[in-house]
From Swiss-Prot:
It comes from Bacteroides thetaiotaomicron (strain ATCC 29148 / DSM 2079 / JCM 5827 / CCUG 10774 / NCTC 10582 / VPI-5482 / E50). Homodimer. The keyword Zinc applies. The lineage of its organism: Bacteria, Pseudomonadati, Bacteroidota, Bacteroidia, Bacteroidales. This is Purine nucleoside phosphorylase BT_4389. Purine nucleoside enzyme that catalyzes the phosphorolysis of adenosine and inosine nucleosides, yielding D-ribose 1-phosphate and the respective free bases, adenine and hypoxanthine. Also catalyzes the phosphorolysis of S-methyl-5'-thioadenosine into adenine and S-methyl-5-thio-alpha-D-ribose 1-phosphate. Also has adenosine deaminase activity. Zn(2+) binds at residues 79, 124, 141. CDD domains: YfiH (cd16833).
Length: 270
């Protein structure tokens, strides 16, 4: 990944950085004002952090973007597969109605300029998508529950339906999240992936010393992207494990649920 800001509070992807008509970012733990398990650059308001500190961090975030957004669209995620189209219905809604629309949403899609689609993670997989032909974008939260339920595949299919998106026009980025080496799971999680048709030898291992399964969420989501027809060269992986690099990125497995979140965002310029 590349640094967007000098203090490295915001990183970016090389593939997306080559397009001048969009902005994107992935936040780190550096350069903010939050404290404790939220230290220091937590921009997510639904994590238990002090509201004023989140607002100050969001101001710093927007100052680091190449264009100030009309809105940071940040859903209240629930590990489901619900998506929201940021279109006429959302744009005509009141602030309160928008908050209600964003509750229980784990994927956002739009072609509207100026609205920064954001996803909050702390070990789960953030996926950013850009359809360079139709000028459409998506931000997807793929925890293990979303991954096993094919949220990335389904979001791409919704983009196909809404915008005409096809695989050859997509650039997709898989962000900092828990790695195969760190993601130990129980039998019930392994069986859920197996039941839903995943290639288990490709996305999992069993550690001899513990007898425990480990799942590769990066590969499980990359396979969904490739299955949509996206060329492998247009899929970028950060390959950064949040559990290992918890000093740089938030990790719920390390810090607990009451902790900060990585914010990944993408926006079409006005």
């Amino acid at each position: 990944m590349i640094s967007i800001t000098k203090d490295k509070r915001m990183l970016g992807y090389e593939s997306l950085s080559s397009y001048s008509n969009i902005s994107h970012f992935v936040t780190t733990r550096q350069g903010g004002c939050s404290e404790g398990n939220y230290a220091s650059f937590n921009c997510t308001p639904y994590s238990g952090d002090e509201a004023e500190k989140v607002r100050r961090n969001q101001t710093l975030l927007m100052e680091g973007m190449s264009q100030i957004p009309e809105e940071l669209v940040i859903p209240v995620q629930t590990h489901e597969t619900n998506y929201l189209l940021i279109g006429d219905a959302y744009l005509s809604a009141s602030s309160q109605q928008r908050q209600e629309m964003l509750h229980g949403v784990d994927a956002l899609i739009t072609r509207e300029p100026g609205y920064c689609l954001c996803i909050s993670t702390a070990d789960c997989v953030p996926v950013l998508v850009y359809d360079k032909k139709h000028g459409a974008i998506a931000a997807i939260h793929a925890g293990w529950r979303g991954t096993v339920a094919y949220i990335v595949r389904d979001t791409l299919l919704r983009m196909e339906k809404e915008f005409g998106t096809s695989g050859e026009d997509v650039v997709a980025c898989i962000g900092p999240s828990i790695s195969l080496a760190s993601f130990e799971v129980g039998e019930e999680v392994y069986e859920a992936f197996q039941k839903n048709g995943f290639d288990m030898p490709r996305i999992s291992i069993r550690k001899e010393e513990t007898g425990k399964h480990h799942i590769d969420l990066w590969e499980a989501n990359r396979m969904q992207i490739l299955a949509f027809g996206v060329p492998s060269g247009q899929v970028e992986l950060a390959r950064i494990c949040t559990y290992i690099h918890h000093d740089e990125f938030f990790s719920a497995r390390r810090l607990g649920i009451k902790s900060g979140r990585i914010l990944s965002g993408i926006m079409i310029h006005k």
